[in-house]
Amino acid sequence: MQRNAMYLKNVAETACNFQLTQYQISHANQKPYECQICGKPFRKRAHLTQHNRIHTGGKPYECKECGKVFICCSTLIQHKRTHTSEKPYECLECRKTFRRSAHLIRHQRIHTGEKPYKCKQCWKAFASVSDLIDIGKFTLMRDFTNVQNVGRHLTIAQLLFSIREFTLVRSPLNVRNVAKHSIIAQHLLNTRELILMRNLMNVRNVKRLLGKVHILLNIKEFILVRNHMSVSNVGRLSLVFLILIDIREFTLVKNPMNVKNVVELLTIVQLLFNTREFTLVRRLMNISSVGRFLSPVQHLFNIREHILMKNLMNVSNARRPSSIMHILFDIKEFILVRNLINVSNVGRPLLLFLI
């Protein structure tokens, strides 16, 4: 009996000495136990043993319900509560229950108003570490913002001039997704930066990003090679679109256009003297279509420029593009070699034909 009493006394003293040693280590901020693989220090040997399982891959604790394995016993206990729906931690203020004590501590800060985590960039305080980590993504060097967002962690970013930083290579975006990222996006001068190579766009999608699109002088930059467009789509991009002198730049080679589509693009078109530039080689036009393009056409002295070689015309068609046709001194220029006229047809294209 005396031996058992002495043994229990020694065990109690040893346990007290061990606890005292651990307590003193916590005050001295010492971490005497170091991992031999990565060099990370720990205060307790049990923490080092648990950490070594990360390197060895050992997971000795297994759930009997679903067979999932864990590194430490406490994680297994928390996992079992998902099967039993047990929530032992209750808030005394609102009686809300939680599975983990850490969740209860974070919830209680809502009632107390405590925000112990502060951002070093703007000194804004947060109730949880996860909120601080999430909001820190907007202030890192790789996630650029503009001056309006500095000091204000905005979930809705405004005026993101370099939105490429918010898009990964393997998950390309189109302009429809850009609008969800930036609700107020105005005057993005370089839209090419908003388009990745694997997800092409057309001009129809540009309208959903930019509410007010002013005069785009060089719309070639908004069109990629594999997704061609026609001039009928250009009109939906620009509300106020002025005279495009050289519309050839707005039409790609594989998607030619005719003058019928040009009228949908240009609301105010005045005196386009060289219509050949608005017609591509593979889709020819005749003079009957020219009248739909130009509402006020005056003084077309050299109408040969409006007629292509493969679509001949006669003098009966020459009357349609010009409502006010003055004296044509040399009508030979309006007659091609393969479509001859006689004297009876000469009087038809001219309203006022003088000597």
From Swiss-Prot:
Keywords: DNA-binding, Metal-binding, Nucleus, Repeat, Transcription, Transcription regulation, Zinc, Zinc-finger. Pfam families: zf-C2H2. InterPro entries: Sp4-like, Znf_C2H2_sf, Znf_C2H2_type. It comes from the Eukaryota. SMART domains: ZnF_C2H2. A zinc finger (C2H2-type) spans 33-55, 61-83, 89-111, 117-133. GO terms for molecular function: DNA binding; DNA-binding transcription factor activity; zinc ion binding. Gene3D superfamilies: Classic Zinc Finger (3.30.160.60). It is found in: Nucleus. GO terms for cellular component: nucleus. Belongs to the krueppel C2H2-type zinc-finger protein family. May be involved in transcriptional regulation. This is Zinc finger protein 781. It comes from Homo sapiens.
